[in-house]
Amino acid sequence: MIIVGLTGSIGMGKSTAAGMFRELGVPVNDADEVVHMLYSGEAVAPVEAAFPGVAKGGVIDRAELSLRLVAAPERLAELERIVHPLVRAKEQEFVARHRADGAPFVLLDIPLLFETKAEARLDRIVVVTCDPEMQRERVMKRPGMTAEKFAMILKRQVPDSEKRARADYIVDTSDSFDVTRQQIRAIVDDLRAG
């Protein structure tokens, strides 16, 4: 089974691209969705222990946690030491399940693919990109996004140019959904061809 990683800097259209892969029948494991699930399950106790007061009603209040991290960005590594191993375990379960089902390939949607050295466990890498102005416009429309928060996120991410240089496939979402869908269909066809 081919294990494909999907990544892209914030606002590049990675979630949209992942949805298009799903539409074509590709099993997709979304690391962000896994984190959301963990924030109402296994991660609650250890995150609350490290960041007292961020759990409300048995769920991690992501807005509160985000505020704490903007105020103390050096604590992000501490959060990642808690959450990343849990996300990785769920990813391994996903891969094992689809391998047992005989899937020819799966897609792992990993926002911090290069930053977490995930490429070592992947066979192919798809990078989603777009024009930098479009990226900024998309990101600044998000609820609760500030220029400070956007800058903090970008600072933590491998630059888009480096991601593209390390990719096996590039999906440029600067154009229409139809053009993006055509690029993704070509990748899926190539992967199915072996």
Curated annotation (Swiss-Prot):
Gene Ontology biological process terms in this record: coenzyme A biosynthetic process
EC number(s) stated in the UniProt entry for this protein: 2.7.1.24
Primary location recorded for the protein, binned into one broad class: cytoplasm
Top-level class of the enzyme under EC nomenclature: transferase
Transmembrane helix recorded as keyword: no
Entry-linked InterPro entries: Depp_CoAkinase, P-loop_NTPase
GO cellular component: cytoplasm
Keywords: ATP-binding, Coenzyme A biosynthesis, Cytoplasm, Kinase, Nucleotide-binding, Transferase
Chain ranges of the DPCK domain: 3-194
Pfam families: CoaE
Record-level Gene Ontology MF annotations: ATP binding; dephospho-CoA kinase activity
Pathway in which the depicted protein is active: Cofactor biosynthesis; coenzyme A biosynthesis; CoA from (R)-pantothenate: step 5/5
Compartment annotation: Cytoplasm
Catalytic activity: 3'-dephospho-CoA + ATP = ADP + CoA + H(+)
Positions with a binding annotation for ATP: G11, M12, G13, K14, S15, T16
Keyword set includes Transferase: yes
Similarity remark: Belongs to the CoaE family.
HAMAP family found in the cross-reference section: Dephospho_CoA_kinase (MF_00376)
Function: Catalyzes the phosphorylation of the 3'-hydroxyl group of dephosphocoenzyme A to form coenzyme A.
Name of the protein described by the UniProt record: Dephospho-CoA kinase
Organism from which the protein derives: Rhizobium meliloti (strain 1021)
Lineage: Bacteria, Pseudomonadati, Pseudomonadota, Alphaproteobacteria, Hyphomicrobiales
